[in-house]
Every structure is written in C-alpha cells, then in structure tokens.
Amino acid sequence: MEMFTFFLLTCIFLPLVRGHSLFTCEPITVPRCMKMAYNMTFFPNLMGHYDQSIAAVEMEHFLPLANLECSPNIETFLCKAFVPTCTEQIHVVPPCRKLCEKVYSDCKKLIDTFGIRWPEELECDRLQYCDETVPVTFDPHTEFLGPQKKTEQVQRDIGFWCPRHLKTSGGQGYKFLGIDQCAPPCPNMYFKSDELEFAKSFIGTVSIFCLCATLFTFLTFLIDVRRFRYPERPIIYYSVCYSIVSLMYFIGFLLGDSTACNKADEKLELGDTVVLGSQNKACTVLFMLLYFFTMAGTVWWVILTITWFLAAGRKWSCEAIEQKAVWFHAVAWGTPGFLTVMLLAMNKVEGDNISGVCFVGLYDLDASRYFVLLPLCLCVFVGLSLLLAGIISLNHVRQVIQHDGRNQEKLKKFMIRIGVFSGLYLVPLVTLLGCYVYEQVNRITWEITWVSDHCRQYHIPCPYQAKAKARPELALFMIKYLMTLIVGISAVFWVGSKKTCTEWAGFFKRNRKRDPISESRRVLQESCEFFLKHNSKVKHKKKHYKPSSHKLKVISKSMGTSTGATANHGTSAVAITSHDYLGQETLTEIQTSPETSMREVKADGASTPRLREQDCGEPASPAASISRLSGEQVDRKGQAGSVSESARSEGRISPKSDITDTGLAQSNNLQVPSSSEPSSLKGSTSLLVHPVSGVRKEQGGGCHSDT
C-alpha cells in the first residue's frame, strides 16, 4: 500500500517538479524588505517574477504609495506580495486578504491619482483569509545558513517559464517545452531572418524541380499505360505521391508564414507564434496532404520491392501480381490514412516556419519519434530486405543462364537498373533518417541554449545547465528538406530511356496538324524515290535474275479521308511471287475499287483477288496459314476461268498456266495488308515497283501509321 501511495504521489507531482524543480528558499536581497521580520523568500512570486532583481524593479511602480505612507501597512503588504515569506514548514506565505483590503482602501485615492495599475494577481478577492496574530518564527541559525542558501539560489533551476508574449488562450491545446498554453515564437527560434529567406528560396527551388520530374514520370505513364505493368506499376503511384508532396512545399513557399504562424495581437500583448493544433483550417489541410502522401510514397516503394520480390524470387507472372493490386492499394492508402487520422485526433499538427507548411514532430519529440522516424525506419528495413532477396534471386537466375549470352546481358542490365534506382531512393531516405535521429539527440540541448540566450530579453528564468551551448546548423535543416524532396526524383531514372523519348516524339507528332495537300505531295515523292531506288537495283542484278524468285512490291497511297480505325495516308508494301519476268521499266497503275484496296498483279497481266488481310502487328501462325490457304485454293480453282476472262477484257493476255500459277502463288503464303478501309480508297493510287529478287519479304507491317 505504501508503494502504491508513493507511486501515485510521484505521478501527481512529477509535472510540477519538471516545471519548477525542487522547493528551495533563498535569503532576501531587496533593500526595502530586509527590515521585515523574515529574511527568507522563494521565487517565482505571485506575479511570476523569477528573481529578486526583477521583483525590485516592479516594486518601483508602487514607491509613491510607500513614500507618502498612505497606509501604515503598505511596505509590509508590498514585501509580502513581491518578496513572499518562505519557511521550511509552510514554504510560501502570501499576504492575507484582510491586509490587502485595508491597504487598498487606504491608498485608493493615491492609486487613482498616480494612475497605478493594480496587478490582477494582487486582487484581494483572490487572496485567502489567514490569522495574522500568529507570529512568524525566526530561526537564529538563519544568518549562519545564509551563504549556503545563497549558493543554492545560484544553482536552483525552476525550469522553463513561458514568456508573456508567447502565452496563448486556453482550450487550444498548445504546449511548448513542457508548458501548457505556450507556443514557439515565429519566425523561427533558431535562425536569423536572412538565413530563413535563403532556406525558403532553396526549398522553393527544389520543390519546383521535384514537381517537374515527378509530373514527367506520371505523364509518361499516361502516354502509354500498357507499358508500365506490374511489377513496375507502383513507381507511377510513388511518383504521384511525391508530386503532391512537392506541390505542398511549393505552396508553402508561396504562402510564407501566413499559414504556419499566428498573427500578433497587440491588445492581448501577444506576439507572433507558431500554429499548434488543428484549429487553423489551412494549416490542417496542408498537414493532411503532406503527411498522408509522404507516408503513402514510402509505402508504395515498399510495395514496389514486394512486387519485384514476387516476380524475381517467387517467379510470379505479371497477371498473378496484378490480381493482388486491390490489396496493394488498400495497404498503401489505408495505412497513411489511419496515421493521419490519429494525429488529427491527438491534435499534433505543427506549423513549420521555415518551409511554410505544416507537419508533425517539429517541436514534439514524441510525435516525431513515433509517427515519422519509426514508420520510415520500418519501411526502409522491410523494403531493403525484400530488395536484397530479389537481387539474390536474379543473380542466381543469371548464373543458370550463363550460356545464353543475350538473355544474360538483358538480365544484367535489369539488375543494374534496379540497383541504381534503389540507390537513388535509399541514399536520400537514409540521410533523412540520420537528420531525424541527430535532431532527436540534440533537440533538448538546442532548446536550453535558446532559453539561455533569450531569458533576459523575455524576462524569464535562465537555466544554469547551459554550460556547453549548442545551436543547430542551417545546413542540417536544408539537407533534411532536400532529402525529403529529392527522394521523388529517383522515378525519373526508371522511365528515362530511349523508348520514353520515342513515345514523347510520337505523342507530339500525332498532335501536330498537317496540310492534306502537302502530305499528298510528300507521299507521291516518297513513292517515286522508292521506285527509282529499287529499279536501279533491278538493273544492276539483271544478269542474275531467276524467274522463280522474282518479287514485286506494290505501294498503295491513299489520298482520301478514312473514317475507320486505321490511319489516313497509310503505306503498305507487299511482296508478290511470280514465275514470269516483267520489263524492268514497267510501271502499272492499278485503279482500286471499294471492293478491293489492292490486287495481286502477275507478270503476265492477270489479276487475282488478294488474300485475307493479316492483323496489325501480329504475324500469322503456321497452322492458321495452312488452313486458310487450303480453303482459298478451292475458291481460286473455281474462279480461274472468270479471272482469265476478266484479264482479257482489260486488254491483257492470260496464259494457259494461270490456274496452275494460282496454286503456286498460294503456296507462297502471301498476305496483303490493307492500309485503309474500303470506304477511303476512292481516288487512291497504286504503284507497281520491280524490286530485286533478294528483297526481304515484309510480314505484318501494314498497320503502321505515319501520323
């Protein structure tokens, strides 16, 4: 039971001991009060004066009353009020209420005449009734113990007392250096105005740079969404988070101290103070967005390492990882949201008078330790462990395929990309953690030094512990803000490649309008250049001609406007095998119709309907080609007679071998891709070009759009 009572008393009085230290009396040194019946006093007094020198200065306002002796008890009352009685048994003895009422009634006229402001702490209604007939005991050993008590006065630490201009109204939950209803000063308590201006400009510049980099990553994703699948997709969400973080710091740079600081109130004698708590709506919104997306960006990086580990270590496919996307989003957005709500409920919002934003843990070490430092350390540990496990798995795969030079080189490049990207993220983040740890260790020393430097200016007690003064360096805070922002730039490295440049070039090319007439001229010019180039090669290799391997290329240029899914002015080239030889300078113009966009032209002048079009970009499989050709061969044998008659009606002679040549042509598996829909082929021009026999056959390339 005694132990429980001791523990309860310790919990009750521990905050008082923290604020004012242990109780200690000290001898009176004020000359006017040295004639009193007591010679020991204790500070601070009822008015909050922390030593006798300040109390003596404040007593000078009441000297007219003492000099004119408006009341016989005026000096007794003033000494008991400003230099209170202190005994080892009763501790502090304030003046009695009856004494206060008698002195105030006797001196009221002089108080009004001289305009003396009566302190609120000395209002008689606040004092208690006491028995003044009890004499104050005088200890004869007091003079002998005087020097010892004076030594205790020098070493006594009564803790931090909040200056008057930093006090806040009740109910807002402000707390500074362990004192309730007290707020930090604004501008920053550690740095000068010129240093703060330089730091704000630096933070604003870095935030703009990081914002541009992260937006570039996100816009690259929007250009080609299918390019970034899992396990790489978290990089995009990671970039979005840090783009919001950069935007918040840029907004703080524009707002200055208007959001992070409270304006001074001259009527209440309050100075500029830092915003603490969630009463300021603008500061609360900045805090919610900044803290939420800072934590979310870190969690998305951890999820990125998880997806890499599943792909490299567990051999999961992209589709299998993508099925877990809902859980990834739940963790990435749910965890920061939960922490943000907890901080709002605990009223831990704090204004940052360096960057202009609002965050957590700037003045509260516990909040910084549990809501910033601990989550970041946990994310770094988990992410680094999974990253190392994935790299070890990839290295094992590289050793297995060491005889496959091409795949081994690709895997090596991929591992290098992962290593560089992880380094660009981990190095700034670990540096940021180092800044937070260093601040945790030295924050108390910085605060004691600040109190020691400004205690006389603010008329508050000066701490005696400040023997080795230490002040924070501006470079430390600038590194902390730099590492906070530069973490998001690492995503640019992952998307920075030749393919990204090609995608951006194609994006601007598709969005640039072209003149239809100029485009038609350009198409015709390219066709002529192509014909002349390949015709010269045919002349050069005329002697080496083989009828069974000769090929023709047909280039179709559409000058109309297509309403279909394919692009206008499309270009398609097909290789057609023939067994006869055409003239080297023969140029045949083929008029297309809505039914057929192209015809396969044979060397003897006969034309046959083209084969089925092949899908864009997808090469035909062997099984599909054989089944398709077997069906088409029957149709072509039945239509051989009609084809010959059609050729004769157009003024061309069809040899008897047309039917057999048709079968031979089908065996070559020729496919003619169409450049546009049939409705857009009116007025199109087809050019028949003689290429050399060694020209390479193009497959599946007819859907490429020039626009």
From Swiss-Prot:
Recorded protein name is Frizzled-6
The UniProt annotation puts the region (Disordered) at 589-707
Q: Where is the composition biased (Polar residues)?
A: 663-673
List the carbohydrate attachment sites.
Answer: 39, 353
Q: Where is the signal peptide?
A: 1-19
Q: What does this protein do?
A: Receptor for Wnt proteins. Most of frizzled receptors are coupled to the beta-catenin canonical signaling pathway, which leads to the activation of disheveled proteins, inhibition of GSK-3 kinase, nuclear accumulation of beta-catenin and activation of Wnt target genes. A second signaling pathway involving PKC and calcium fluxes has been seen for some family members, but it is not yet clear if it represents a distinct pathway or if it can be integrated in the canonical pathway, as PKC seems to be required for Wnt-mediated inactivation of GSK-3 kinase.
The organism of origin for this protein: Pongo abelii (Sumatran orangutan)
Task: Give residue numbers for sequence motif Lys-Thr-X-X-X-Trp motif, mediates interaction with the PDZ domain of Dvl family members.
Answer: 498-503
Family designation: Belongs to the G-protein coupled receptor Fz/Smo family.
Ranges of the Extracellular topological domain: 20-202, 256-285, 347-371, 439-474
Q: Which GO terms describe its molecular function?
A: G protein-coupled receptor activity; Wnt receptor activity; Wnt-protein binding
Statement: the UniProt record of this protein carries the keyword Nucleus: no
Q: Name one GO cellular component term.
A: cytoplasmic vesicle membrane
